[in-house]
């Protein structure tokens, strides 16, 4: 930028006397020219005389120039012309001030909108501003100059009166870019402090142009002029560093969301319960807005944004929830675990208690037997007295033999095998103690003459088969005798009928049509006029023999409608453990005890293992039942679980009970179970209160006999085919056991 000089030539206005007093206003300073600014001019309150301002340090503007400054520059010789220059300076400063205010308002609004962004500061071109700031017309006359001075003084006074109201403590940063001919101006920083000058003594605006600030004391210019103070010119020069730019405070980061669980992890916006940005989830369980996760997966990212598990658009599930809150269930889970632990300990204690009761019962019976033997021996000794040594030795041998026989183990020995059917298809059997007759279901031996199925009668006295009795047209699935001495046989078959057959006449005396295949049947021990039929759909029909038309009641299953594989009646008993009477219904999914009271039935679901149940048999005297399970996921072998039936009074009532059961002993068999077999639980032939359990094992084609007290395997009765049914018998004070296969019956005797 070209450097311009400001020269004031007033040779005609000053005389030789005044010209000798004027000092040079331009002094060379290196390669720069220093321009001394005059002090501010003020008016006195008492008179209209013009006064120069007090002697104060002022700024000195150093103008760079590519050319060397002249050695001597003509200084202004008239103080009025110096006053004119100062007034011109103030006028231009006021104009600059108004433009600065407009720029400041614009900058302030822009800064509010772009708060937090980076600021770029730039200064105006100092040299261009200064060249226009200090230009004075050299050909200007004195009279017009004085008139213009008065006009500018008024303007200056009005502008200075407005300065305090417009002053601000903020620092305004102006950015301008000026282009000159063939060269570009440097960008400097300009700070304009509007509140620097007090209202009483207005001073020109302070310009900081990143250059040298000069302070000096002015010498007297003229003693003849009527001014109260002398005009001082700056003589002392000192340097000042650049004032640093006032930086804006950094933008504070926005506070995080108070509840980050309500925002989408992709766009960080709250999800909604309706619309496009509604709450959605992936298979991994992470939550997003629907549109966000849809765009995410469409963009080629086939993974969850949070866990990087594989995901696709079909995995997006819209959740219909107003809000999500994690429920603290730690206390609930802790209580559940403690409850399960308590229940397991209770079951263990019940099992130990039941085993102890069985052992006490066995030991009590054994003790009673020993006492009876001791009494018999004492009687023998009293009758024969102290005989010879031979008699004594024989007595000792008798005692030892009695003790050994009482403590020795008895077992079943094979007695006879009886062929029932050449073609097979035998299924179930039952024993009538009053007639000493064992009946076995079989297909008709003469299918052309007598089609269908019936029973074959076996005499338990001579172990011979007598004759075949036809009953049903399809396979027989259940046989049961009444406790009355009438010889009535109840049979259930797949031909949708339940029939009563008299063994005295070998004829069917009553037929009931059930409408569905019948899988099992039993008699009511408390009232022999009622019989039960278990259907394929899980229902149990109750028939009254005095009503020959229809069933009197239907017991509808509470759960799944699985076939009734077993029916057993539990008679009432004067027992504290289980005094209730009713029918025990066993299905493929579990068991239910229907308590009978005043010809009304109340169901009690027993807590058995879900699924896999093939048979349930009852031992009515000890209130134990045997539940057979086929192999499953948890066990790969056939299990027989002996359960003890229990009951608790409800609300201190004398007649209302809650019936249940718990396991006492478990017996393990082979790993094969393809047929629905029937097992047996009965009292030991020793009459000592011991309960024996006998179950068929398809893997070894045998019947396994266990002791229920300690769970030990007592005996293994071998067979040629899988054992389908087991029936204990009492014949002439002898205990026998019959096992049935598809073709024959094997008889074992307890010895």
UniProtKB/Swiss-Prot annotation:
Q: List the disulfide bonds.
A: none
The GO biological-process annotations, alphabetized, read as: interstrand cross-link repair; protein ubiquitination
Q: Where is the composition biased (Polar residues)?
A: 20-30, 121-142
Q: Where is this region: Disordered?
A: 1-33, 97-188
Reactions accelerated catalytically: S-ubiquitinyl-[E2 ubiquitin-conjugating enzyme]-L-cysteine + [acceptor protein]-L-lysine = [E2 ubiquitin-conjugating enzyme]-L-cysteine + N(6)-ubiquitinyl-[acceptor protein]-L-lysine
On cofactor binding, the record's note says: Binds 1 [4Fe-4S] cluster.
Cellular component, GO annotation: cytoplasm; PML body
Q: Does the record carry Zinc as a key word?
A: yes
This protein's name: E3 ubiquitin-protein ligase rfwd3.L
């Amino acid at each position: 930028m070209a450097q311009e000089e400001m020269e004031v030539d007033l040779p005609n206005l000053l005389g030789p006397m005044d010209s000798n007093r004027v000092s040079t206003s331009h002094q060379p300073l290196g390669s720069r020219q220093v321009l001394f600014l005059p002090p501010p001019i003020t008016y006195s309150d008492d008179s209209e005389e013009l006064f120069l301002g007090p002697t104060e340090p002022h700024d000195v503007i150093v103008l760079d120039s590519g050319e060397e400054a002249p050695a001597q520059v003509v200084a202004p010789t008239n103080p009025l012309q110096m006053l004119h220059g100062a007034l011109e300076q103030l006028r231009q400063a006021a104009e600059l001030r108004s433009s600065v205010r407009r720029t400041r308002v614009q900058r302030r609004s822009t800064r509010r909108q772009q708060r937090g962004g980076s600021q770029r500061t730039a200064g105006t071109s100092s040299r261009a501003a200064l060249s226009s700031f200090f230009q004075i017309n050299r050909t200007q006359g004195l009279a017009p100059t004085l008139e213009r001075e008065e006009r500018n003084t008024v303007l200056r006074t009005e502008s200075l009166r407005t300065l305090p109201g417009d002053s601000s403590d903020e620092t305004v940063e102006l950015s301008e870019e000026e282009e000159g001919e063939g060269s570009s101006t440097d960008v400097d920083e300009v700070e304009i402090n509007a509140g620097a000058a007090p209202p009483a003594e207005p001073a020109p605006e302070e310009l900081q142009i990143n250059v040298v600030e000069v302070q000096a004391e002015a010498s007297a210019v003229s003693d003849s002029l009527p001014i109260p103070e002398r005009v001082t010119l700056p003589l002392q020069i000192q340097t000042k560093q650049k004032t640093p730019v006032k930086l804006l405070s950094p933008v504070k980061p926005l506070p995080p969301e108070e509840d980050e669980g309500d925002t989408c992890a992709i766009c960080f916006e709250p999800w909604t319960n309706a619309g496009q940005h509604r709450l959605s989830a992936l298979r991994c369980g992470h939550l997003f807005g629907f549109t966000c996760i849809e765009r995410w997966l469409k963009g080629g990212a086939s993974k969850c944004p949070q866990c990087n598990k594989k995901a696709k658009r079909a995995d997006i599930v819209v959740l219909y929830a107003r809000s999500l809150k994690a429920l603290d269930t730690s206390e609930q889970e802790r209580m559940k675990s403690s409850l399960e632990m308590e229940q397991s300990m209770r079951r263990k204690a019940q099992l130990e208690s039941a085993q102890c009761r069985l052992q006490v019962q066995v030991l009590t019976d054994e003790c009673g037997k020993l006492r009876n033997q001791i009494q018999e021996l004492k009687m023998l000794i009293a009758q024969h007295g102290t005989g010879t040594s031979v008699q004594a030795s024989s007595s000792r041998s008798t005692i030892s033999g009695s003790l050994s026989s009482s403590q020795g183990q008895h077992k079943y020995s094979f007695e006879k095998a009886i062929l029932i059917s050449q073609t097979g298809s035998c299924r179930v059997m039952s024993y009538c103690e009053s007639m000493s007759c064992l009946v076995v279901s079989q297909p008709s031996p003469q299918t052309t003459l007598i089609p269908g199925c019936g029973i074959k009668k076996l005499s338990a006295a001579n172990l011979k088969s007598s004759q075949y009795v036809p009953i049903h047209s399809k396979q027989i699935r259940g046989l049961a005798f009444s406790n009355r001495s009438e010889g009535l046989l109840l049979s259930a078959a797949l031909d949708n009928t339940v029939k009563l057959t008299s063994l005295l006449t070998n004829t069917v005396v009553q037929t009931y049509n059930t409408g569905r295949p019948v899988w099992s049947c039993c008699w009511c021990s408390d009232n022999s006029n009622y019989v039960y039929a278990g259907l394929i759909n899980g229902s149990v029909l109750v028939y009254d023999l005095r009503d020959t038309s229809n069933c009197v009641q239907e017991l509808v299953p509470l759960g799944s409608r699985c076939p009734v594989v077993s029916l057993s009646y539990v008679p009432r008993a004067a027992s504290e453990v289980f005094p209730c009477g009713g029918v025990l219904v066993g299905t493929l999914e579990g068991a239910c005890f229907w308590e009978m009271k005043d010809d009304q039935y109340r169901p009690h679901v027993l807590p058995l293992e879900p699924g896999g149940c093939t048979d349930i048999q009852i031992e009515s005297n000890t209130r134990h039942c045997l539940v057979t399970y086929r192999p499953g996921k948890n066990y790969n072998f056939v299990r027989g679980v002996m359960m003890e039936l229990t009951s608790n009074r409800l609300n201190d009532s004398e007649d209302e009970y809650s019936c249940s059961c718990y396991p006492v002993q478990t017996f393990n068999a082979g790993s094969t179970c393809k047929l629905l077999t029937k097992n047996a639980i009965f009292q030991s032939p020793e009459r000592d209160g011991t309960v024996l359990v006998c179950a068929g094992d398809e893997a070894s084609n045998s019947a396994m006999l266990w002791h229920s007290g300690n769970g030990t395997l007592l005996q293994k009765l071998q067979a040629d085919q899988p054992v389908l049914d087991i029936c204990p018998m009492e014949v002439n004070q002898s205990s026998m056991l019959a096992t049935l296969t598809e073709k024959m019956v094997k008889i074992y005797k307890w010895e």
